[in-house]
């Protein structure tokens, strides 16, 4: 698996496996085991996904050495402050049955992110986290976080797909040494992604699926991607993107699909902020 070096000096796989919406315990455990068997080493979960215990169980069952894995989890909103971040992190670590996590992210850009960040800086210094980062932060919020803290985020996990390409945010992150990571690279199939004529034509040229074309496009932009599936054959397909390269013309054709609009929602929509901040979970 190819990796990218984060600003902490550690290596992060460029292709990862996410477990968002895997609420069935047995299915989640089996999916993580299958993903590791297929070659994935980056496993991405979150306290809010309510499946950290299942991820931890699966990791133990695989027998893969801990230093070969890259495990990410995330701080949910209700504890986005100094004391809350410290406490929720320990609960996540216990559920994952690990001594440390490779990457810990603030899941949403709300609450006392500065207090939570200072707690995360201390956890990193204590060796419990190898790298700290954020999710869904626009560049202005990142600039604010960087200005008033010591550690520059290692990763910003944001929505990136052919319809929302983050053409301004991605270069800004990269220019500050922050690694972009794509959630929902397939936009959950919205806008007819898997049947899109541009993507299907490019796929036919290389004998690849639309999913493989999208993941390769993200890969060539230097962005880490997270693909999710409970089917092992799809996991194997999604990771098999290193044996072809999109041409400059292919990249331009995909760039033309950008709408600069989320396939889901805006993190600056007041109604969405109210909904997210009101979502109290048992984490």
State what each model feature region is.
Residues 1-69, 186, 280-283:
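N-terminal binding-site loop/beta-alpha segment at the start of enzyme catalytic domains
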Residues 1-4, 53, 57-60, 89-91, ...:
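Alpha-helical scaffolding within the catalytic cores
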Residues 7, 85-105, 122-126:
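CE4/NodB-like, metal-dependent polysaccharide N-deacetylase domain
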Residues 22-26, 44-54, 78-83, 109-114, ...:
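Acidic-and-aromatic substrate-binding clefts and catalytic sites of carbohydrate-active enzymes
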Residues 23-35, 81-96, 115, 140-143, ...:
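Short, acidic/polar
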Residues 40, 98-101, 129, 153:
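A structural motif
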Residues 66-79, 102-109, 136-139:
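A short, structured active-site edge motif that brings together acidic residues
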Residues 108-283:
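Beta/alpha (TIM)-barrel catalytic core signal, keyed to glycine-rich beta->alpha loops juxtaposed to Asp/Glu
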């Amino acid at each position: 698996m190819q990796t990218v070096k984060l600003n902490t000096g550690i290596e992060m796989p460029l292709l990862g496996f996410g477990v968002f919406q895997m609420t069935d315990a047995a299915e989640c455990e089996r999916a993580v085991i299958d993903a590791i068997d297929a070659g994935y080493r980056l496993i991405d979960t979150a306290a809010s996904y309510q499946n950290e215990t299942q991820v931890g169980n699966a990791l133990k069952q695989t027998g893969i050495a801990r230093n070969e894995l890259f495990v990410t989890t995330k701080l949910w909103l209700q504890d986005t402050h100094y004391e809350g971040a410290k406490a929720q992190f320990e609960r996540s670590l216990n559920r994952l049955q690990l001594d440390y996590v490779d990457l810990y992210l603030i899941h949403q850009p709300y609450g006392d992110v500065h207090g939570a960040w200072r707690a995360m800086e201390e956890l990193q210094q204590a060796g419990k986290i190898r790298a700290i980062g954020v999710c869904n932060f626009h560049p202005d919020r990142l600039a604010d976080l960087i200005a008033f803290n010591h550690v520059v985020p290692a990763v910003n996990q944001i929505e990136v797909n052919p319809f929302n390409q983050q053409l301004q945010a991605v270069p800004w992150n990269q220019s500050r040494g922050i690694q972009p990571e794509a959630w929902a690279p397939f936009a959950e199939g919205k806008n007819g992604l898997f049947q899109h004529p541009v993507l299907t034509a490019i796929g036919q040229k290389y004998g690849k699926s639309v999913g493989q074309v999208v993941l390769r496009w993200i890969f060539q932009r230097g962005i880490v991607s997270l693909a999710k599936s409970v089917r092992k054959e799809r996991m194997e397909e999604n990771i098999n993107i290193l044996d072809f390269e999109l041409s400059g013309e292919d990249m331009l054709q995909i760039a033309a699909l950008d709408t600069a609009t989320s396939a889901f929602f805006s993190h600056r929509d007041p109604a969405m902020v109210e909904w997210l901040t009101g979502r109290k979970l048992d984490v």
